[in-house]
Amino acid sequence: MVINQRSIRTIFKHSVLAALLCASLPSVATEKICAIYPHLKDSYWLSVNYGMVSEAEKQGVNLRVLEAGGYPNKSRQEQQLALCTQWGADAIILGTVDPHAYEHNLKSWVGNTPVFATVNQLDLDEEQSTLLKGEVGVDWYWMGYEAGKYLAERHPKGSGKTNIALLLGPRTRGGTKPVTTGFYEAIKNSDIHIVDSFWADNDKELQRNLVQRVIDMGNIDYIVGSAVAIEAAISELRSADKTHDIGLVSVYLSHGVYRGLLRNKVLFAPTDKMVQQGRLSVMQAAHYLRHQPYEKQASPIIKPLTPKTLHDDTIEESLSPSEYRPTFSIKAVD
C-alpha cells in the first residue's frame, strides 16, 4: 500500500497528539492506603510508621498517615476515618484507640472501604466484620506474661517478698488490659507482690510524675511499666541516686528502653517487632487491593530481651533507625 507525504504528516500529527494526551493523563491508578495510629508519642508507633513507610515505597503505593494524639481521643480518630474516605483511600489500616470503639458503627465512618487492623485488637460485630480484611498484631497478654515470667523466675515462691509498682499506661486503652492480665497470671505462684498500680496516658510528663510518686514510696524493688514510664524512670532514678535500688522492667520495647538494655539500666523487655508489623500491614492491604494472596492474620513471634540477648536482626525488625522521623505521606513513584 502506498502512503503519500500528506498522509504521513497526518498520521505523525495524530500520533504526537495521542502521545501528549496520554502523558497528560494519570498512569494506571496507584493504590491509596490511609493509616491511622492512636498516637505517635513514643518510638513504638514511630517504628510501626517506619515499617509502613518503607513497605509502601517497596510496594509502590500512596500512603497517608494520621494519628489521633492519644488513646482518649476517640472522636478525633472517628473524624480521621472520615478523612481517609474523603481522601479516596482504597484501604484503611487502623490502629484503634479502643478495641470496642467501632464494634457497631465502623461502616458509618468508612462506608465500604476495606479495613486492616494493626497492632491493637479491633472487635467488630457480624455486620461490621465484613469490612475487616486483615489483622496484624500479637496478643499483648503474652507481652505482659513474658515480663511477669521474667520476674517470677527471679523471685520464686519462698524466696522472699518482692515489691513492685505497675505503671502500664492508660487503664483501659491500647494493650493495657491484656498486658495486666498476662502479668498477673505469670506471677501468681511467685513472691512478687504488687504494692500499687498507677494509670495515665503514655505521655512523658504524666508518666514522669507517676515515677516520682513511686520513688517517694520508698519500698519498691521494681517498676514494671510501659516504655514511656521506663524511659522516664531511667532518668528519675539517676537523679534520685536510686538506680541500683529499683529494677526496671518494660512490657514492650522502644529506642529508650533499648538504650537502657544496652547500658544495663533496664533488665528486661519483650518485643513484638513493630517495624515488621508495619510492613505486614501495608503488605496485606497492597496484596488485597491487587487480588494477590496474603496472610489474613499475621503475628510476629514475641522475643524476650535482656542486656545479654540483643540480637541485631531482632532489633532491626523492631526499631526504626535512630535518625528516622515521623513520615505522614508517601507518594508512589511512577
Locations of regions flagged by a protein language model:
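Hydrophobic alpha-helical segments within soluble ligand-binding/sensing domains
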Residues: 134-162, 207, 253-257, 273-290
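Structural motif
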Residues: 63-88, 196-217, 230-233
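Short, solvent-exposed amphipathic alpha-helices that sit
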Residues: 44-61, 143-150, 174-192, 232, ...
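Extracytoplasmic "Venus flytrap"
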Residues: 32-51, 55, 59, 64-80, ...
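Flexible loop/hinge segments that line or gate small-molecule binding clefts
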Residues: 99, 104-142, 254-267
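Hydrophobic alpha-helical
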Residues: 94-111, 183, 200-260
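Hinge/cleft segment of the Venus flytrap/periplasmic-binding protein
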Residues: 167, 171, 276-334
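Periplasmic-binding protein-like
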Residues: 34-37, 88-96, 114-118, 165-168, ...
